[in-house]
Amino acid sequence: MSTIAAKPLSSSMSDGLSFMGFVRQGGLVGVRNHLAIISTVALCNRIAELAAQRHEADTDEPVLQIKGEFQRGLQLADAQLQNQVIRQLIEHPNIGAALVLCHDRRSAQAWQKLFTNKPVEVLAVMDGEGVGSTIELASQALERLGQEIRGYVRVPCPFSTLTFALECGGSDASSAVCSNPAVGQFVDVAIAQAVAGVDKGVG
């Protein structure tokens, strides 16, 4: 464990910091520009995987896959919470565009009404004529969405538009024994720039 005190920050380390990010509608800023495919029900997981693999093979562009192992049959508050989490993932500023996969048309219609601030397409598996047809429809949608985000460019953004998730422990044998001076020094810089942060302490 380290017993060396962290050096005080110089003003040059915290003055006028910026980064190159993707500005989204509503003012949020992303540091990534992911094309994502989101399966809202486990029945769609394999279709999401195969459609993503086909797009990656055709374009050499990565697709962020977001899937769950159990998503169907939840009721009331449980279903609302699950849908809220999925929606917040789609709205994350690091996602530039998203394809949402549902099982039935009714669910697809509900999801289609939710997103207006970024390119999002919703596809119901029941709209396809079997798995192969649905994979083809999903691949076509990914291509359209990919074309949308290829035109996005990074622009200078103030450091204060970032939100950081921090973990102070779990990285070495000294976790929960002593503090992490690197995290502490970073937080000092972040606070000086009015950055939001969420810390997960391990101990």
Briefly describe each language-model feature range:
Residues M1-E167, S171-G203:
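Metallocofactor- and cofactor-centric catalytic cores in central/energy metabolism, strongly enriched
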